[in-house]
Amino acid sequence: TAQSRQEAQESGKKWFPCNKGGSFRKWYGNNDFLVNWKNDGEEIRAFKDENGKLRSRPQNMDFYFREGITWSTLSIGQLSMRFSPKGHLFETKGSVLFFNSEEMLIYVLGLVNSVVIYELLQVLCPTVDFHEGPIGKIPVLISHDDMDLVIRVVHQNIEASKQDWDSYETSWDFKQSLLVNGKNLTAAYT
């Protein structure tokens, strides 16, 4: 993957990861989609209907390829947010929050995946649509006393979720099934 739009364009590559939401999954994962972003999205940006009207209008392209927090804006249950590493694009159903520091990104990821925020979102967002408006209204209380602990626990959660995600053959970083590590099915999952 690329670390910036310029790097993506200079690479000459065609396909890049894209956040499009997905099923309930906290901390990491739902990395399922690729998008044709060759030549800075030339084909997508020029895509027109039969009347010549533009059908696609990518937004906020300066934020493409940055790390952030992504989530599925439509959910029938609890909101789940995930770490999105550098190198991904995003679209409307796979929104992304961006931060000026990785420390704040990780801290806020811990906050938004908490039970407290879930209860708050029941008031701010009583429907199944967790779009940017209600998410942007979430109050962020920064506890400097607890920040190191929260960041450490969130990193552990991301790593555990990434290991789980990568144990499936559909993961781009798949190496080996968990079943291979155990002598039988019970041993593989205990």
Where are these regions (language model features)?
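Polyanionic (Asp/Glu-rich) segments that form extended negatively charged tracts
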Residues: 188-190
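Polybasic, glycine- and aromatic-enriched phosphate-binding surface used to engage nucleic acids
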Residues: 1-159, 163-183
